[in-house]
Amino acid sequence: MEESTMNSIAVFCGSSIGASDAYREGAIQLGKELAKRQITLIYGGASVGIMATVADTVLQEGGKVIGVIPTLLEQREIAHQQLTELIVVNTMHERKSKMMELADGFIALPGGPGTLEEFFEVFTWNQIGLIQKPCAIFNIEQYFDLLISFFDHMQQEQFLKAQYREALIVDGNAAALLDQCQSFVPPAIKTYELSK
C-alpha cells in the first residue's frame, strides 16, 4: 500500500510545561524530527508551554511552523511572533477547522482538557469519514496510559470498533511515531447498525 503524503502535522499540546522535564524533552525530540523530515508544524500559535517548545525547536532546526490562533488569545499577547506564518481567526472553532484543513496528520502531546478535546474531534472525524488522516498520541513518560486503557475499555464494551482502536497510533518515541504516521493506511469508514 502507498504511504500517506505527510507534508504537515498538527500538534495538540499544553499551554503549560507540565511537572516533568521529560515533557519538554519529548517536545524537543518531536520538533527535531519534524524539521529533519521537512514536515511543516501546524499548531495553536502560542508562545507558551509545550506548544512553544515544539515550535521553537522546529524553527531552530530550520523547519517551517504555521500557527493558528484566535483573536481572543492573540489579544492576550501570547501569540508567537517568530513563526513562518501566523494565521489569526475569529473563534476557537475556526482555529480547529483551519488546523484540520492544513494538516496531513495529528499528534497529541501531554496537555489538558483542551488538548484532549481537539484530539477527540479529529479522531471522531476519522471515524465518520470527514477526514482520513493519521491520529497519533505521543505517550511521553506514559502520560496517556490511562487514556489508552480507556480506549481499550471502549473497544471491549463495543463503543469503539477494533479498526479504529487499531488505527490509533501510540508511541513514546518521536521518530517511531512519525514513521507510523507516514505509513498510515486509513480504516474503513464507520457504518451504523440498528439495535435489535
Segments predicted by a language model, with ranges:
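Short, proline-centered helix/strand-breaking motifs
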Residues: 110, 129-139
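A short, small-residue-rich loop immediately preceding and capping a beta-strand
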Residues: 41-43, 104-114
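Generic secondary-structure microfeatures
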Residues: 69, 103, 110-111, 126
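A cross-family phosphate/adenosyl-ligand binding-site feature
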Residues: 2-102, 119, 140-175, 179, ...
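Arginine/glycine-rich "motif VI" loop of SF2 helicases in the C-terminal RecA-like domain
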Residues: 59, 126-133, 159-160
